[in-house]
């Protein structure tokens, strides 16, 4: 039996798990955004 590929892309799932509003919803998520702003990331979230 062949092993299935584990990455099954979906823009909706991506946004729900890693999107800006998902990050803003928790204190730790806001810390992630703060870190990425401090680092100077062009894109803060998915």
From Swiss-Prot:
Q: Where is the composition biased (Polar residues)?
A: 1-11
Question: What Gene Ontology terms describe where this protein resides (cellular component)?
Answer: ribonucleoprotein complex; ribosome
Which Pfam families did the record assign? Ribosomal_L34
Q: Does the keyword Disulfide bond apply?
A: no
Where is there biased composition of kind Basic residues? 32-46
Q: Give UniProt keywords alphabetically.
A: Ribonucleoprotein, Ribosomal protein
Q: Region (Disordered): which ranges?
A: 1-46
List, in alphabetical order, the Gene Ontology terms for molecular function in this entry: structural constituent of ribosome
In the record, the note on similarity to other proteins reads: Belongs to the bacterial ribosomal protein bL34 family.
Name-wise, this protein is: Large ribosomal subunit protein bL34
Question: What is the native source organism of this protein?
Answer: Xanthomonas campestris pv. campestris (strain ATCC 33913 / DSM 3586 / NCPPB 528 / LMG 568 / P 25)
């Amino acid at each position: 039996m062949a092993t299935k590929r584990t990455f099954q892309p979906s823009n909706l799932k991506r946004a729900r798990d890693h999107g800006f509003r998902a990050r803003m919803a928790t204190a730790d998520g806001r810390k992630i955004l703060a870190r990425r702003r401090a680092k100077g990331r062009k894109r803060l979230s998915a």
